[in-house]
Amino acid sequence: MTQSILSNLNHPNDIKNLSYSDLKYLAHEIRQRIIEVLSVNGGHLASNLGVVELTLALHKVFESPDDKFIWDVSHQTYVHKLLTGRNDRFHEIRQFKGLCGFSHPKESIHDHFHAGHAGTALSLALGVAKNRDLTKRKDYIIPIIGDATLTCGLTLEALNNISRELKRFIVILNDNAMSISKNVGAITHILSRLLSNPTTNKIHQELDTIVSKIPNYGPILSQQGHKITESLKNLVSPAVYFEQYGLSYIGPIDGHDTKKLVDVLEGVKDSNWPVIIHVLTRKGEGMDEAIKNPISYHGAKPFSKDTGKFLPNPVTKPTFPKIFGSHLLKMAEKDPSIVAITPAMSAGSCLDDFMKTFPERCIDVGIAESHAITFAGGMAYGGKMKIVASIYATFLQRAFDNVFHDICLQELPVVFAIDRAGISGPDGSTHHGIYDISFLNAMPNMIIAQPRNGQVLKELMESAFSWKRPTAIRYPNLMTEEFNHPICERELGKGEVLIEGTEILIVALGHMNQAALKVRDLLAQTGIEATVLDPIFVKPLDSELFCKLLLNHNKIVTIEEHSVVSGMGSIINNFLVGQGFNQIQVLNLGIPEAFLDHGRNQDLLNEIGLVPEKIFRQIQSHFNLIAQNTLNPVA
């Protein structure tokens, strides 16, 4: 049995003297370690299996942390973590108080940014390189970007800002979808210069004119000549594309050949200009199931490490996104004016069936959130189409100005289906959807609503187009009750009293009503009968209902899985002041003004006090309540 190499690695320098046969065995060990841990924890599997040799080559050639690897999105840094002293904690990845699933500077000096959103690496790297040059340092800056990153406007802006004089700047294009031409060799470089040369183009045009005049065969020869030229252009397009930005293009290179990668990286270290190395990798390399289905194994759920098959999921209820996706499809089958738009999240947002059924009415614009929102505004212009922009809450942050300038200011009736609203568990602080109410509430004309269950979600979806205003319907990725009752029209801005009592009014947003009802039961055991109100609408608030309830309630508790800063609680506080309810005592509960870490949702909620027992205790403490009987319902 071969002795483990991985278990004896303490620093990335430890791999520099390994033979290529040892590196091959280490790559095998790394893949087995990733598969073993993620079979239990879940996580970004396919992309990490695909970058093993690339990461080994980078650490073999460069000196981390002095030389800086800046990973775009950084969900593919598991191998990097294993090589930089975190193997002993790798079993904790994405777990509460464990390793982050993305790069994180607080975790290691080898991680330079806490990333999680796409398209940022190149801009960050250029900034780091400028800092290096101004401070007269000589370290290498190596941004690692994916092929999908090239759809990001931010990446294109950064490309446009690259200087030809920039040295020790090496961009790695990790192409795991082979979406860019994979033709290779010196001929690519030669033809790129030849076909982009104005003189060559002029000669081609003149020859085409002469050939086309040949009797009988002229048009055929001319047509074939055009086909050959277009083929050659496709052959060389990567070089032509990147070199116009000042980057010297090399590749494509086999991303699973460690020696070839090392040779190329060593060869460009002394380049006098910025370089981009096009590396072809395969998502899921080393695991058959992940290779066959890289989308499902991108963010994999727990699976059998022996067979690779996903473990049975004892799901008894649908999730909010599944209800959204299936109901939107039903609506679209009845109404041909409904169009869905998504920025590269059709699978996560459960729009795949919609896309298969109505491909012309489900538009995936790629990782381009700003464009997605403004594009939605353009489609909504004129009022003949009903536009649903489906987007994760954390990614909507990237399109703040587009929502303001291109939707709300224009008074366009786009419906925002805001997925992953609330805590996003193992993905952590880069992905929690806990700020959208804060910035959307500042937008004039905007409607903000959140359903407590699948039935209310469907009713909001059915009603939203009739309001003819920008509308945000936010919901978490959690299981919920669907009910399938007849769908009633939702009146704009109207809430619902779930249980009526006196003295304490508990206002809970969306799925937090489940916790609110449990809190009410705990309060009831101490002699207090509270009212539970589901406002449904954060904007506009049901002012009539609030004013009525406040006649016999002198305490309000707001509960939301959102930042307490400018969230629902703040909105209600402003309402109370504006209406003159100055004697009302208020307790606002939500996510504190801090970056919330990663872990299971329940662990995170418990830590910040948003579970029923802790909410109950906070209510008792804040309002100085004295139990009216001796029952202590909480241990």
Curated annotation (Swiss-Prot):
Residues annotated as binding thiamine diphosphate: H75, G116, H117, A118, A148, T149, N176, E369
Entry binding sites for Mg(2+): D147, N176
Keyword vocabulary terms for this entry: Isoprene biosynthesis, Magnesium, Metal-binding, Thiamine biosynthesis, Thiamine pyrophosphate, Transferase
Entries under Gene3D superfamilies matching the protein: 3.40.50.920, 3.40.50.970
One GO cellular component, as annotated: cytosol
UniProt xrefs under Pfam families: DXP_synthase_N, Transket_pyr, Transketolase_C
InterPro entries given in the database record: Dxylulose-5-P_synthase, THDP-binding, Transketo_C/PFOR_II, Transketolase-like_Pyr-bd, Transketolase_C, Transketolase_CS
Broad EC category: transferase
The protein's required cofactors: Mg(2+); thiamine diphosphate
Cofactor details (free text): Binds 1 Mg(2+) ion per subunit. Binds 1 thiamine pyrophosphate per subunit.
Highest taxon, organism lineage: Bacteria
A GO BP annotation: isopentenyl diphosphate biosynthetic process, methylerythritol 4-phosphate pathway
Transferase keyword on record: yes
Single GO MF annotation: thiamine pyrophosphate binding
EC number: 2.2.1.7
This protein's pathway: Metabolic intermediate biosynthesis; 1-deoxy-D-xylulose 5-phosphate biosynthesis; 1-deoxy-D-xylulose 5-phosphate from D-glyceraldehyde 3-phosphate and pyruvate: step 1/1
SUPFAM superfamilies: Thiamin diphosphate-binding fold (THDP-binding) (SSF52518), TK C-terminal domain-like (SSF52922)
Catalytic activity line of the entry: D-glyceraldehyde 3-phosphate + pyruvate + H(+) = 1-deoxy-D-xylulose 5-phosphate + CO2
Similarity-based family: Belongs to the transketolase family. DXPS subfamily.
Matching NCBIfam families: dxs (TIGR00204), PRK05444.2-2 (NF003933)
Subunit: Homodimer.
HAMAP family named in the record: DXP_synth
Full protein name: 1-deoxy-D-xylulose-5-phosphate synthase
Species, as recorded: Protochlamydia amoebophila (strain UWE25)
The organism's taxonomic lineage, starting at the top: Bacteria, Pseudomonadati, Chlamydiota, Chlamydiia, Parachlamydiales
Gene from which this protein is expressed: dxs
